[in-house]
Amino acid sequence: LPVLLHGSHAGLPRIYDIAACMAGRRDGRIDEATVYAFMEAYQSVTPLTMAEVAELPNMLNAALVKLLTLECERALEAENSMETAKSAAAQLERIKERARREAIIDRLSLGEDPVLCECLYGMMKEHDEGIAELINAKLQLEDKSIDGLCAKAAAMRRRSTQRADNVIRSLRCIGGM
């Protein structure tokens, strides 16, 4: 199979790059009509060999499995963020000094991790409103809001779930091609 010499998929078969583009640009949503339209458009510029066309279903499977792997890695990162939030919540509840609580919150970089922020804030709002207010004040210093970060965390979950669902449907579709 012809191999790419440049780009992010250099050294890989050209048909894998096509499959990865199809999978990535459509959030894992691939059906027969998409494949045919994409292939027709691609071949109007650069013809593919018969071997490449025959290998397309396998390469689509590989690209979709890679996309699903990335979603699983994101899910593990979210799980780690939730575990960090639980640990921090327990630590914050044990400590009563405001300065030490602030230091713990500062180390967490809540504004950079919406899942961690959402989880920790939710736990603190339930158990210690003072810490929840402290978290909100720290976020405001960074020009961020708890509502905005919680919305971002929810959007990330929805998109990840949708992408995983798309990949599974696409794998089934390709299996039937």
Residue ranges and their predicted role:
Residues 6-10, 72-94, 106:
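Helical subdomain adjoining the active site within ATP-dependent kinase catalytic cores
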Residues 4, 11-51, 60-77:
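Active-site activation/catalytic loop segments of kinase-like enzymes and analogous catalytic loops
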Residues 54:
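A short glycine-rich, hydrophobically flanked beta-strand micro-motif that places a catalytic Asp/Glu
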Residues 86-177:
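Basic, amphipathic N-terminal segments
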